[in-house]
Design a protein with these regions (language model features):
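Ligand-binding pockets and gating/stacking loops
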Residues: 1-309
Length: 309
C-alpha cells in the first residue's frame, strides 16, 4: 500500500496485487489492507479456483467500448449527486474503484497478464502443476501463480503477494517431516522457475523476490515428532533486485535457538525492498487522515548493507 501511494499505478494495472487465497486460518490468506492510506491502495485480490475465469471477468464480454463509456457517464452523473450528501469520504474511495475497474475493462492488459495460455508450453511446464485443493486451513498449491506474478509485474504491477500451501505441521498427526519432503521440492520448483524466468527475460535486476514466514521453528522436536512455533529466530530468502546475492547473512547458535551474529530485523527487509524500488527512506512520507506524516520504517532502519551496499 505504501508503494501504491508513492508510485501510483499504471492505467489498467493495479499497483498492489494479491494472489493470496482465503484460508481457514484467516491471517494466512490476507495480504493486508490500505489502512489509513485508503482502500484505493489496498491489494486487489485476483485469485480464483479457475485461473481462466479470472481473466474472462476482466474483459468486455461482447459489450462495445462505446457502450461501456456511455454507462460510465450515466453512473458518474448519479455519483456526483451522492457525493454531495456524503460526509464519510467513502464515495471518493468508490470513485477510485470504479475508475480502476473501467480502466481494466477498457485496457485488457490485466486480463492478458492473467492468461498463462499465452506462454510457451515449456515455460508453463517448468513451474509445475496447480493443485486447487485447499490444504486443511491453508492455501491450495497453485504453483503456477509464480508465473502469474511474473506476468503481472511485466504488465506494470509494482507489488504482488502470493501464498502457497500450508506450513503449520506441528499438530498431532506426526507428519511434519514427511510433509517437508513433499512440500519443499514443489516450492523449490516454482520459486526456481520464477528466478530462472526473470534471468532469461533480463528482469533479474528489476524485480525483487522475498520468501518468508512470520516465525521460525523450535530447535527441539516435540513429542509429536514435529517442530513448534519459534519467534526467536527465522529466515528469509531474497533474490533479484540487482542485489549482492549468493551469501548467508547472520547466524544462529549451533542449536538454531537465537541469532548470535548479524541479526536482521523484518523492517530491514522492507527497507531493502523500498530501496530497490527507488524510494528514498530519508524523505518519503505518507500522511494520515489528520495530515501527520509517517515514514515507511522506524528511525535508524536502513536497507541491508550486505545486499545493497
Amino acid at each position: 500500500s505504501w508503494v501504491s501511494k508513492l508510485h501510483g499505478s499504471k492505467p489498467g494495472i493495479p499497483a498492489n496485487v494479491s494472489l493470496m487465497y482465503p484460508t481457514g486460518n484467516r491471517t494466512w490468506g490476507e495480504a493486508g489492507t490500505g489502512g489509513f492510506i485508503g482502500n484505493s491502495h489496498a491489494p486487489m485480490g485476483l485469485v480464483d479456483k479457475d485461473p481462466n475465469a479470472r481473466a474472462k471477468s476482466m474483459t468486455l464480454q461482447g459489450m462495445s467500448l462505446d457502450r461501456l463509456m456511455d454507462r460510465e457517464a450515466l453512473r458518474a452523473s448519479m455519483d456526483r449527486l451522492k457525493a454531495r450528501i456524503d460526509t464519510t469520504g467513502q464515495m471518493e474511495g468508490l470513485d477510485t474503484y470504479n475508475q480502476q475497474a473501467l480502466e481494466i475493462l477498457a485496457d485488457g492488459n490485466l486480463a492478458a497478464a492473467l492468461d498463462v495460455s499465452q506462454e510457451h508450453p515449456s515455460v508453463v511446464e517448468r513451474y509445475g502443476i496447480n493443485d486447487p485443493k485447499y490444504q486443511r486451513d491453508g492455501a491450495p498449491k497453485m504453483i503456477r501463480n509464480f508465473l502469474v506474478a511474473r506476468r503481472l509485474v511485466e504488465a506494470g504491477a509494482r507489488v504482488v503477494s502470493l501464498n502457497y500451501s500450508r506450513w503449520d505441521w506441528h499438530g498431532g498427526d506426526g507428519l511434519n517431516f514427511p510433509r517437508s519432503r513433499e512440500e519443499f521440492p514443489l516450492l523449490d520448483q516454482g520459486l526456481s522457475a520464477l528466478i530462472t524466468d526473470l534471468h532469461e527475460r533480463g528482469l533479474q535486476n528489476d524485480v525483487s523476490i522475498v520468501m518468508w514466514g512470520e516465525f521460525g521453528r523450535t530447535p527441539k522436536i516435540n513429542k509429536m515428532n514435529s517442530r513448534d512455533h519459534w519467534p526467536k529466530a527465522n529466515f528469509a530468502f531474497v533474490a533479484g533486485g540487482g542485489m549482492n546475492l549468493g551469501q548467508v547473512i547472520g547466524a544462529t547458535d549451533k542449536h538454531g535457538n537465537e541469532p548470535i551474529e548479524r541479526p536482521v530485523r523484518f523492517q530491514e527487509v522492507f527497507a531493502t525492498l523500498y530501496h530497490n524500488l527507488g524510494i528514498d527512506l530519508s524523505s518519503a512520507t505518507v500522511e494520515d487522515a489528520s495530515g501527520r506524516p509517517h515514514f515507511l520504517v522506524d528511525p535508524g532502519i536502513k536497507p541491508i548493507r550486505e545486499l545493497v551496499g
